[in-house]
Amino acid sequence: MSKNLTIVARIEANADKVELVKAELLKLVAPTMKETGCVQYDLHQDNENSAVFLFYENWESRELWQQHMNSSHLAAFIKATEGSLASFILNEMTKLSYA
């Protein structure tokens, strides 16, 4: 089995900040995809609650994901969305089965 790390990040914007949060999340995609170790970095928006976003990420290792967590573009996102998030839940996952 692969040693890749899967990250599922659930971000919920405050009701009045959905468009701001969405724009800032979209800014993360291009620079993150260029990072060493990033295999997949997909952003989703809930069909019924537009304030809910989900990143589905795959990284070559936890160490390389940690480098991402310390990146300047992630720091810029945190600063730009300060006070705009209702919740931010991060899960580190291990893939158990393959289709």
Model region roles, listed by residue range:
Residues 2-5, 43-48, 78-99:
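Glycine-rich beta-strand-turn "strand-cap" elements at beta-sheet edges
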Residues 6-11:
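Active-site-flanking beta-strand signature of metal-NTP-handling nucleotidyl enzymes
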Residues 13-18:
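Short, surface-exposed ligand-recognition loops at beta-strand->loop->(often short) alpha-helix junctions
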Residues 27, 33-39, 58-91:
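An amphipathic, aromatic/His-enriched active-site/gating alpha helix that lines ligand/cofactor pockets
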